[in-house]
Every structure is written in structure tokens, then in C-alpha cells.
């Protein structure tokens, strides 16, 4: 496995090519350009790359599809068991989905960020999350999402 202390490798799973280009431009900005970006269209490609690259963080970008949301949460849970040192950040479509992901996630996440934020706020939140190396689920973003709505019942979780 590649071990490079000076370079932090960030994996982004994004199945929309236009969004992937947007994320590439975001990570080309001065505050994020010191990370080496690896784009994947699906989790299987990312799993194969895990054997060659020591990833610092996984950013899983979601659309509004329920099936994709369920698959994302299952993959992120599996990653938490097999590679607990990798940060797990989810980019949700909007604030509502971000709160939903915070409630439904079966594993601890480093952060959930809404893609509907302004570019400036999205960039700031990613800088904060990627700068926090050890504090999983101990950041203001997760606390804010969790405090916005009550926790879901087991029945509600099963339905969603």
C-alpha cells in the first residue's frame, strides 16, 4: 500500500460527471489544492483503489435517490469496519437529505454536508472537516443536523 505522509489522498465517489468536474474545480482552489483527489463513479472502483492508495478521507456524494442513499450508508458502514482510519464524509443533495443521513447512518460519520450551500460555505465546511483528523462525530455540523429534528423511530428508519 502506498504510504505518503506529505500527501493526503481524498477519494470522492460521484456518479454524475458534471458534479465530478465541479468537485475537481473546488479542490483546485488554494484552500483545498494540497489534497490529491481521486474520483470514482462507484464504490467498487474505490474498493479496488484501496489496495494501492492510503486514503485519508472518503467523500461520498449523493443524489436524491433512495436506493443510492441506502447503498451509500451500507458501503460507508462497511468501510468503518474495515478501514476505520479513513474519514467518512457524505455530500447530501440538500439540507433535508443531510438531516436524514445524520439520522439514518448506521455508522459514525465524520461529517454530512449539503451540496445546496453556496460555494464559499461548501468550501469552508470541507476545509473544517478535512482539517479535523481525530474527531469523528464531534463537530458542529453533525451536532447542528442532529439537533434540528427529533430522532427517528425504528419504524420510520425502516420505511426510509
Each predicted region: which residue ranges?
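N-terminal regulatory/sensing modules of transcriptional regulators
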Residues: 1-138
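Helix-turn-helix DNA-binding segment
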Residues: 141-160
Amino acid at each position: 500500500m502506498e504510504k505518503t505522509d506529505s500527501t493526503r489522498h481524498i477519494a470522492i465517489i460521484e456518479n454524475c460527471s458534471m458534479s465530478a468536474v465541479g468537485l475537481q474545480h473546488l479542490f483546485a482552489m488554494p484552500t483545498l489544492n494540497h489534497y490529491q483527489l481521486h474520483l470514482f463513479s462507484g464504490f467498487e472502483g474505490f474498493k479496488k483503489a484501496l489496495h494501492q492508495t492510503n486514503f485519508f478521507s472518503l467523500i461520498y456524494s449523493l443524489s436524491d435517490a433512495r436506493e443510492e442513499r441506502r447503498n451509500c450508508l451500507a458501503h460507508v458502514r462497511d468501510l468503518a469496519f474495515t478501514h476505520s482510519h479513513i474519514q467518512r464524509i457524505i455530500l447530501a443533495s440538500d439540507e433535508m437529505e443531510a438531516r436524514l443521513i445524520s439520522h439514518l447512518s448506521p455508522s459514525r460519520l465524520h461529517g454530512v454536508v449539503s451540496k445546496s450551500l453556496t460555494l464559499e460555505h461548501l468550501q469552508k465546511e470541507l476545509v473544517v472537516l478535512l482539517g479535523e483528523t481525530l474527531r469523528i462525530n464531534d463537530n458542529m455540523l453533525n451536532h447542528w443536523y442532529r439537533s434540528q429534528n427529533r430522532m427517528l423511530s425504528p419504524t420510520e428508519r425502516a420505511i426510509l
